[in-house]
Amino acid sequence: MRLTFNQTLSTAAGHPDAAESQEQKLNVTVVFTCVKATVAAMKKAGALAESLGARITLVVPQVVPFPLELTSPPVLLEFQERRFRDIAKLSPVEINVKLYLCRDEMETAKAVLKPHSLVVVGGRRRFWPTREKALARTLRKAGHEVIFIEAE
């Protein structure tokens, strides 16, 4: 297992990285929602990635509230890095963690994903609409293939 940790310290520019666009290896993207749901999504993404010979990208849109500068998140980046390294250790395949400091997590997730990406989103099991289900629906409408995993 190899882990690459990238920190993006600005809002998404609306385009995937040029270096990533040229890579040929299939990518399964997991969008962070909450720890429990993301762990469930990572397990499903790990199984998919193993069977497809793909790698996993964990996209973490961290919302920074307006009173704070975008480069000054309320949670220390070192803490976030440790937390996501621990989550990434659960996967049997290569994982690339991308942390985006942003104002709107849905817009950031839409902006940083390559067109027609395979995305796994974890969420809570509820009868009413949740933030996670809204994210999955938004990404589907944007043209991505989305798998929603319900966490217990």
Task: Give the label of every model feature segment.
Residues P73-I87, T130-R140:
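Short, aromatic/basic amphipathic alpha-helical patches
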Residues R2-L3, T8, A12, A47, ...:
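Acidic, proline/glycine-rich short linear motifs
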Residues A19-T71, A142, A151:
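Small/aliphatic-rich secondary-structure junction motif
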Residues T38, L77, L99-C102:
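A conditional alpha-helix N-cap/helix-loop micro-motif detector
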Residues K43-G46, S72-P73, V112, K133-A136:
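Short, glycine/charged-enriched secondary-structure capping and boundary segments
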Residues M1-Q22, S91-V119, R126, L135, ...:
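Structural beta-alpha unit
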Residues V31-V35, Y100, V121-R126, A151-E152:
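Structural motif
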Residues S51-L52, R83-V93:
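Short helix-loop-beta junction
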